[in-house]
Amino acid sequence: MKKVNSLSGGKSSSYIAANYPADYNIFALVRTNDKSCEYPDKKIRQIVSDKIGMEFIATLEQDNIIKVMLDLEQFIGKEITWLSPKTFDEVINSNGTGKNGKQYLPNMMTRYCTTEMKIKPIFEWWQKEINEIVEMRIGFRSTEMKRAKTVMDKLNSKGIDEMKAVIGKSKNGNRNRWGMVEWRVPTFPLIPDNINNTDVFNYWQKN
C-alpha cells in the first residue's frame, strides 16, 4: 500500500513529512482571487503559480504557510505536490448557499470548505495519479485522540474512508452515475509514537 503524507502547512504535519518518509507528500492550498490580500513577494507568487499550474494571487491561510512549505520541500529533499484547482471565491460563488438559496451557517461552511478545498482536491489527485487504496498520514498529535476518533468513526466496516464520486455513466449515457469510492486508510503516526506539541516544537527549534 502506497503511503501519502497529507500536509497542512503546520508544524505537526511538517514533522511527519520530515520523519516519516512517504511515496507522496501532498499540500492543498486555499487560494483567493482577492487582490486586497495579495501575497507580497512577486517572486514567490510566481513560484507558487508554477507549482499549482495557475495564477496564484493570495491565500486565505496565513501567508507564512507558503514559505514554510517551500522550505519544507528543501528540508526533506523530496517534492511536495501542491494542489489548488479552485479558489475560495469560485467555491463560494458556485456552492455558497444551501437549499432555497439560504446561506450556510458558519460551522457548516467551515466543514464544506474543508471538504471542497482540502479533501476533494486530494481525492481528485489520487484518482488521477494512484487510484488504489493508500495509507494517508494525518498530523494529529498524541493529545488529539478525539480528532482522530472523529475521522475513524466515518470509515466503512473495512476501516477505509470513502468519497462520493462519479463511477461511470447511466445506461443511456446521458448522466453521470455516482457511488462511494474507497480511497484511503487514515493513520496518525504521532499518536502511537506519543509525539506531543512540545516534541514537535522542540524538533523545529533544533532544525
Task: Mark where each language-model region is.
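Nucleotide-activated chemistry modules centered on ATP-dependent adenylation/adenylyltransferase
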Residues: M1-N207
